[in-house]
């Protein structure tokens, strides 16, 4: 994907996040942060809180997912992009997503420090379903 298009996609998802909010009666939820990524709008680091609704079938499928958070463009855009992809996907498949999945989703290679930003929503999802 063209670098300009990637920047536009990430900026759009950061400014107009999809699935932003909190589910009223989630089956699973978790909040996580990356204190190493600080900025003027997020002096304590990136934060993502995820709420998830799962199907009753076996294996369960993600029926709904919403997030709230603050942080760098990459962390918030990735949370938006990830939640779009999670809906309708079996939980066991989502927990297997890795850095390659994230890089494909955001359209670029990620350094280890940027990967920590991009994976916040995925880490929150894994912890949420593990804790339920």
What is each PLM-predicted segment?
Residues 12, 39, 49-50:
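Structured surface interface patches that mediate subunit assembly and partner/cofactor docking
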Residues 33-43:
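Short Gly/Pro-enriched turn/cap motifs at secondary-structure boundaries
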Residues 45-47, 60-62, 77:
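Short connector loops at helix/strand junctions that flank enzyme active sites
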Residues 78-89:
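Alpha-helical support elements that line or immediately flank enzyme active sites
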Residues 43-44, 69-76:
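Short, thiol/selenol-centered motifs that function as redox-active sites or metal-ligating centers
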């Amino acid at each position: 994907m063209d670098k300009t298009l990637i920047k536009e996609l990430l900026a759009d998802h950061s400014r107009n996040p999809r699935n932003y909010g909190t589910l009223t009666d989630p089956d699973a939820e978790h909040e996580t942060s990356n204190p190493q990524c600080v900025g003027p709008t997020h002096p304590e680091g990136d934060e993502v809180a995820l709420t998830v609704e799962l199907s009753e079938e076996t294996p369960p499928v993600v029926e709904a997912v919403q997030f709230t958070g603050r942080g760098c463009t990459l962390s918030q855009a990735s949370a938006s992009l990830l939640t779009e992809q999670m809906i309708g996907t079996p939980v066991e498949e989502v927990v297997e997503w890795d850095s390659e999945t994230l890089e494909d989703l955001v359209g670029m290679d990620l350094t280890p420090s940027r990967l920590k930003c991009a994976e916040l929503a995925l880490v929150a999802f894994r912890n949420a379903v593990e804790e339920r």
